[in-house]
């Protein structure tokens, strides 16, 4: 089959959507042709996709988005999640239809075979885009987590967990659409499945002396591929101030992180910290850690797979609802939003985690229990294809 992805990534919106789709693509590339359709990308991401997928199509926004089209609209529906409306700047119907025509034209140039499946992972696109693409693509799959606009799709995937997970898309998708909801359908890289086979569930610890030596007071810090608010440096600054604690830390930033030089200078002052730039070894770094300070989003499920507790600072609006719910269920510690959390709150949370290993162990075990650890790494893509071809 020919499987196409419509997805974007940038310093501003982050790289999570791109990496999620690339993970899905790698689950099926042995048997299917994969095309990515993207707007302008950071250079290193463009190179990554060119090396990873069969075809990369880059869209020129100037060909389909005029000044008059830069008006946005949020569709009204009875159960639209009002708390996330401001997170999604949905393109007007006219702009979405123009973009669909542009995508079809580009696809026709690149291949004589229309996509059998189009997977759309994009907050600015909704039903008008998908309906227009149906003229050329056999099946439509949408990846979403906002539930704030309608989708004309055959399958909808939302890997996140909410209090109303099973009802939040009512009225927003066709009645016959297959819904793949919750962390059972978490999209994880093959490396996390491989590394997690070496993980055993942490016992509930009775004292600080019971911590396994290789996990003792070792902190992992990571806020994704771009970290536009530079929360990483804020956290490292607080780690620097913890003079009375003995710990080590791995600090991880992605290829789109814009403050590498300043962070390198800061980390170099501390022999108990190691900086990793655009590392492929996140599962191994998670294996080493006692706990992690990081963002929400897909990293919730990576930590859960690796049985690692998270102290979470949300860096995007779409991370808040799931993180709040996981915090309520004692599956993570939510410190707050990146723009609002204070240095004192970060420091106190780190001190709590270092002083309370048994409570951190409970959080890790609770999060791990949300996932199905028996399924194979291609489970999500296999389920999508089976749902469409059944």
Task: Show where each model-derived region lies.
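A short, glycine/small-residue-rich beta-strand->loop->alpha-helix junction that serves as a flexible
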Residues: 8-20, 44-45, 120, 230
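Acidic donor-binding loop of glycosyltransferase active sites
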Residues: 287-298
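Conserved nucleotide-sugar phosphate-binding/catalytic loop shared by glycosyltransferases and other
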Residues: 31-93, 97, 336
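A nucleotide-sugar donor-handling region in carbohydrate enzymes
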Residues: 152-230, 261
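C-terminal alpha-helical cap of glycosyltransferases
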Residues: 373-390
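Donor-nucleotide binding loops and adjacent catalytic segments primarily
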Residues: 197-289
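A short, well-ordered alpha-helix in the C-terminal region of glycosyltransferases
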Residues: 352, 359-373
């Amino acid at each position: 089959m020919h499987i196409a992805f419509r997805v974007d990534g940038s310093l501003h919106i982050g790289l999570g959507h791109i990496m999620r789709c690339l993970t899905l693509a790698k689950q099926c590339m042995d048997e299917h042709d994969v095309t990515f359709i993207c707007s302008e990308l950071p250079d290193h991401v463009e190179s990554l996709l060119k090396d990873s997928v069969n075809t990369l199509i880059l869209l020129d926004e100037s060909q389909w988005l005029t000044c008059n089209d830069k008006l946005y609209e949020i569709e009204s529906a009875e159960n639209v999640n009002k708390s996330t409306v401001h997170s999604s700047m949905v393109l007007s119907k006219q702009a979405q239809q123009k973009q669909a025509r542009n995508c079809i034209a580009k696809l026709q140039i690149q291949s004589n075979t229309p996509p059998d499946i189009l997977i759309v992972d994009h907050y600015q696109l909704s039903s008008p885009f998908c309906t227009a693409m149906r003229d050329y693509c056999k099946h439509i799959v949408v990846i979403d987590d906002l539930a704030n606009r309608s989708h004309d799709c055959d399958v909808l995937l939302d890997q996140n967990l909410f209090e109303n997970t099973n009802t939040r898309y009512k009225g927003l998708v066709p009645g016959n659409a297959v819904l793949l909801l919750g962390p059972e359908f978490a999209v994880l890289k093959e490396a996390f499945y491989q590394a997690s086979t070496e993980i055993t569930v942490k016992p509930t610890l009775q004292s600080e002396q019971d911590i396994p030596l290789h996990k003792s007071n070792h902190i992992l810090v990571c806020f994704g591929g771009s970290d536009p608010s530079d929360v990483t440096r804020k956290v490292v600054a607080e780690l620097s101030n913890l003079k009375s604690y003995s710990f080590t830390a791995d600090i991880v930033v992605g290829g789109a992180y814009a403050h590498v030089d300043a962070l390198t200078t800061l980390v170099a002052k501390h022999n108990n910290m190691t900086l990793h730039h655009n590392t492929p070894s996140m599962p191994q770094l998670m294996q080493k850690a006692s706990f992690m300070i990081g963002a929400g989003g897909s990293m919730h499920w990576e930590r859960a797979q690796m049985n690692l507790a998270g102290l979470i600072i949300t860096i995007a609006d779409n991370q808040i609802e799931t993180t709040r719910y996981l915090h309520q269920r004692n599956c993570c510690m939510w410190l707050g939003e990146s723009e609002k959390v204070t240095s004192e709150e970060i420091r106190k949370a780190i001190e709590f985690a270092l002083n309370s290993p048994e409570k951190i162990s409970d959080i890790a075990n609770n999060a791990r229990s949300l996932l199905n650890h028996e399924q194979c790494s291609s489970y999500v893509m296999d389920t999508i294809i089976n749902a469409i071809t059944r």
